[in-house]
């Protein structure tokens, strides 16, 4: 019988990585990463293309082969069955593919599958409804998923993850296909889930979103952890310029004092 998770106190480790390494063929993608993610926080993973962000997220979720130690909910990753792991972590993949024309409601309901046959299956209707409201998809629940726009599909996929109601959310570029309003909506949902006790790890390409919404930022470079800490300590012009190999400027926001991050651009009008 699958062992359900127990409630964790605020600040408890939700995932602990020690010496995490991964290869793809002859190329080292992750090299000795040590990282702890705690309940109640939003941790943003940033870095240039190929830095190892998605691989790290997949390794934490148990979907990418790796060496080193991964501990989820106080026990080694390999000690959990597939169902037990699905009760503890939910993964939003970078790309969502469905071979059949499931409706939006059916896709979101898939997030409840780990709880089938447990007392928590009584929460299915509430969890599905809450997730669809949070992501703004209640207006098209009967539409086939393949017929949706890219942004709509992204929000439905996130709703499925939220409906799973796990203590650890692993989100790979949750805002990549979204406009500005829906980006802010998604991170509002993420912040509320963290405030309610979840641990959230999100791969984010938009450094401004990471600076504005993350409690901590982990910067990956060449498969290694270059820095990890609060946004105002980690997202500095020298480090980002080195990591992205492009001149970066960082300013404090006049109202929030959070870092505002921009690529350095020549002054004056753009050249024709």
Give residue spans per PLM region.
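Helix-to-loop junction immediately C-terminal to a conserved catalytic motif
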Residues: 61
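Conserved ABC ATPase "signature" region
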Residues: 122-140
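The feature captures the beta-strand-to-loop junction immediately N-terminal to the Walker
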Residues: 46-48
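Conserved ABC ATPase signature
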Residues: 144-148, 152
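Catalytic Walker B motif of ABC-type/P-loop ATPase nucleotide-binding domains
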Residues: 169-173
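Conserved ABC transporter NBD signature motif
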Residues: 66-76, 85
């Amino acid at each position: 019988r699958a062992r359900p998770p127990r409630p964790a106190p605020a600040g408890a480790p939700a995932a602990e990585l020690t010496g995490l390494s991964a290869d793809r063929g002859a190329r080292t993608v992750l090299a000795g990463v040590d990282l702890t993610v705690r309940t109640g926080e939003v941790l943003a993973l940033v870095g240039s293309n190929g830095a190892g962000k998605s691989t790290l997220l997949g390794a934490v979720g148990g979907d990418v082969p790796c060496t080193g130690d991964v501990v989820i909910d106080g026990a080694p990753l390999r000690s959990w069955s597939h169902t037990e792991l699905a009760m503890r972590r939910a993964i939003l993949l970078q790309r969502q593919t469905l071979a059949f024309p499931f409706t939006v409601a059916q896709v979101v309901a898939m997030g409840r599958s780990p709880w089938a046959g447990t007392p928590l299956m009584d929460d299915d209707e509430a969890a599905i409804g809450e997730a669809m409201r949070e992501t703004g998809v209640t207006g098209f629940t009967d539409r086939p998923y393949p017929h949706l726009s890219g942004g709509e599909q992204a929000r439905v996929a996130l709703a499925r993850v939220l409906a799973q109601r796990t203590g650890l959310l692993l989100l790979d570029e949750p805002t990549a296909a979204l406009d500005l309003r829906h980006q802010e909506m998604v991170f509002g949902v993420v912040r509320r889930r963290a405030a309610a006790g979840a641990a959230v790890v999100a791969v984010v390409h938009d450094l401004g979103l990471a600076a504005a919404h993350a409690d901590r930022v982990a910067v990956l470079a060449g498969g290694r952890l270059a820095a990890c800490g609060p946004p105002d300590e980690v997202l500095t012009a020298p480090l980002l310029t080195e990591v992205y190999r492009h001149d970066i400027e960082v300013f404090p926001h006049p109202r929030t004092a959070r870092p505002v991050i921009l690529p350095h651009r020549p002054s004056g009008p753009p050249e024709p």
